[in-house]
Amino acid sequence: MARRPGSSSRGPARPDRLAPQAVTSARRPQTPDKSPKPASPDPSLVLLGEFGRPHGLHGEVRLKSFTGEPLAIAGYGPLHASDGRTLELEDARPAPGGSPDLLIVRVKGVDNRSGAEALNRITLAIARERLGQAEDEDEFFLTDLIGLAVEDPSGTVIGTIVAVPNYGGGDLLEIRPAAGGPTALLPFTKAFVPTLDLAGGKVVADPPEDLFAPPGPKPADDPG
């Protein structure tokens, strides 16, 4: 979960403080999460993790957990996989020498390396309705941000949030400009997004002037 920020960063893009069978919501965080994936594009689902490479020969696989308590992901029973399957984790443990959110897991029905290889880059999500309501008015799911209007400090609508990706350096807001054209990415920090008004269906952003500027021309090839 995420919480309204009290610092320069809005932190984890994933549910925080999750406990088996008792996930609540996302907190507007204090520190950034380094999860590589955006919030689930389906607002009825909340992203919990992403599979990586196989581990060993007997079906185990690496999993990046997006939950505040990484091992909690194994306690939610059947989960929605991005390839359309329903998958259930049977076992999870911290990956040796890895970051705290990197796990070695076993998936029910997967007992060999080829099955584990087929899981690589597949994400796991949970139905939002299974998570209950936020316990704190400052808590929310990052999927709640998708569809919000983006206003500049003067109150002019400059775009709409279409995704909340995280490529390793902190959460980003992908914004479709109101004037049309390609989307742009804005760091989801208090400096760039000082106001978040879920009830009002908007955020107030203070973006750089060139946020929606087209990329400059590529430098000419060196004739030498």
Swiss-Prot record:
GO terms for cellular component: cytoplasm; ribosome. GO terms for biological process: ribosomal small subunit biogenesis; rRNA processing. Residues 1-12 have a biased composition (Low complexity). Residues 137-211 form the PRC barrel domain. One of its GO terms (molecular function) is ribosome binding. It comes from the Bacteria. Residues 1-46, 204-224 are annotated as: Disordered. Binds ribosomal protein uS19. The PRC barrel domain binds ribosomal protein uS19. NCBIfam families: 16S_RimM. Belongs to the RimM family. HAMAP family: Ribosome_mat_RimM (MF_00014). An accessory protein needed during the final step in the assembly of 30S ribosomal subunit, possibly for assembly of the head region. Essential for efficient processing of 16S rRNA. May be needed both before and after RbfA during the maturation of 16S rRNA. It has affinity for free ribosomal 30S subunits but not for 70S ribosomes. This is Ribosome maturation factor RimM. It comes from Methylorubrum populi (strain ATCC BAA-705 / NCIMB 13946 / BJ001) (Methylobacterium populi). The lineage of its organism: Bacteria, Pseudomonadati, Pseudomonadota, Alphaproteobacteria, Hyphomicrobiales.
